[in-house]
A protein has these predicted regions:
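N-terminal Rossmann-like FAD-binding beta1-loop-alpha1 element of flavoenzymes
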Residues: 2-24
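Short, well-ordered alpha-helices that flank and scaffold nucleotide-derived cofactor binding pockets
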Residues: 17, 21, 49, 105, ...
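Glycine-rich FAD pyrophosphate-binding loop
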Residues: 20-38
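Conserved N-terminal glycine-rich FAD pyrophosphate-binding loop of Rossmann-like flavoproteins
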Residues: 32-52
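A conserved beta-strand/loop capping segment in the N-terminal third of enzymes
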Residues: 48-102
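A conserved short coil-to-beta-strand element within the FAD-binding core of flavoproteins
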Residues: 116-126
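Conserved small/polar residues in nucleotide/adenosyl-binding loops
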Residues: 128-135
Length: 136
């Protein structure tokens, strides 16, 4: 089996890592390897553990934040209200280009081939190895 994973963000990199670890020939395509994606970069603690991310990529541990929408609606988030005062729970803030590169490199280290390029179309073919039940 051979698999092409299109997009080297967290989901694509994670998929490529799992496939490569299973011994499946994997290509991971990403159009911008140095992309500084304009997103908040907030990662809940459970996802830091789930993705097995090292603390070195976390720039800041946040317990309180205010999110402001483009229409200026504000939402305050406080982990103290949910978990009480504890340093064990936090939201990790990181730069996406750092996290994405870490995850892509980990997939590559496990055997995935990283390709810097834009995928605009995919040609596929059908291969029949046995007659279908309709042909009987």
């Amino acid at each position: 089996m051979r698999v092409a994973v299109i997009g080297g963000g967290p989901s694509g990199s994670c998929a490529a890592e799992i496939l490569a670890k299973a011994g499946i020939k994997t290509w991971l395509f990403e159009r911008k390897l140095d992309n500084a994606k304009p997103c908040g970069g907030a990662i809940p603690l459970c996802m830091v553990e789930e993705f097995d991310l090292p603390e070195s990529i976390i720039d800041r541990k946040v317990r309180h934040m205010r999110m402001i929408s483009p229409s200026n609606r504000e939402v305050d988030i406080s982990l103290d209200r949910v978990y009480g005062k504890s340093d064990n729970e936090f939201i990790g803030m990181c730069r996406r280009e750092v996290m994405d590169a870490f995850m892509r490199n980990r997939a590559s280290d496990l055997g995935a081939t990283l390709i810097n390029g834009l995928v605009t179309s995919i040609d596929t073919c059908l291969l029949y190895t046995s007659p279908s039940p309709r042909d009987s």
